[in-house]
Amino acid sequence: MRAYSSHKDIIKLVNKVDSVGLVPTMGSLHEGHLSLIRRALSENEKVIVSIYVNPLQFNSSDDLKKYPRDIKNDLQKLEALSDIIAYVPNDNEMYKKDKKKKKYNFGQFTKIMEGKMRPGHFNGVGTVVEKLLRMFNPTNAYFGEKDFQQLILIKALVREQKLKVNIVGCKTIREDDGLAMSSRNKLLNNTERESAGHIIRLLNKAREPVSYTHLRAHE
């Protein structure tokens, strides 16, 4: 594993390879991230993993400040995987002096679900993802289906900007109780964590088919 803070150093390593996989992350890596990276390793000659907590996608400075960070542990996890190229930029490297959200034509989709609760969030995500895609020109870029609204919008961004990259959606990796793995799970207290696990159990229960006999019994 090799870690770089400058994208120019990485470009020198990958500009002549047949296929490059990119896995954008905000760090605090867990098994969900590692599953994306393993898939990228199986499908590409070189794999770049970016670790950058993007300030443009946060709606408050407190939320940004609280986001879990553990770069030392992250790099150790990458070291254990394979020949990973880690990109660990600071704000100046990523945005220079132009630290502004780009506005995308995502339409009404940004005004529902997470977009409704976090105005401007997806423009912030799109800004950093587009920068990473243009920096490294990867063959494939990997994102979890856990953030399905984000995944759909990134695919829309790629079409809108006419970027030549294959966006790969990867299945959600879950905890033992069914909760989707997330870096933010670390911010939950015991009561909140238990409640989160209970919600997914209720959702799974609701998906179970109701038998015809059961319906007849309640007529």
Regions found by a protein language model. Give the residues of each.
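Divalent-metal (Mg2+/Mn2+/Ca2+)-assisted nucleotide/phosphate chemistry catalytic cores
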Residues: K65-N140
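ATP-dependent adenylation/pyrophosphate-handling site
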Residues: L41-D62
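Conserved phosphate-binding loops in nucleotide/dinucleotide-binding enzymes
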Residues: R174-L202
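Conserved small/polar residues in nucleotide/adenosyl-binding loops
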Residues: T213-E219
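Di-metal (Zn2+ and/or Mg2+/Mn2+) metal-binding site signature of metallo-dependent hydrolases
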Residues: M26-A40, Q150
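Residue-level signal for inorganic ion chemistry
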Residues: H30, L78, F143, G178
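Internal alpha/beta domain cores that form substrate/cofactor-binding pockets in large enzymes
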Residues: K116-F136, A141, Q149-C170, D176
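Positively charged, low-complexity intrinsically disordered leader regions
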Residues: M1-D18
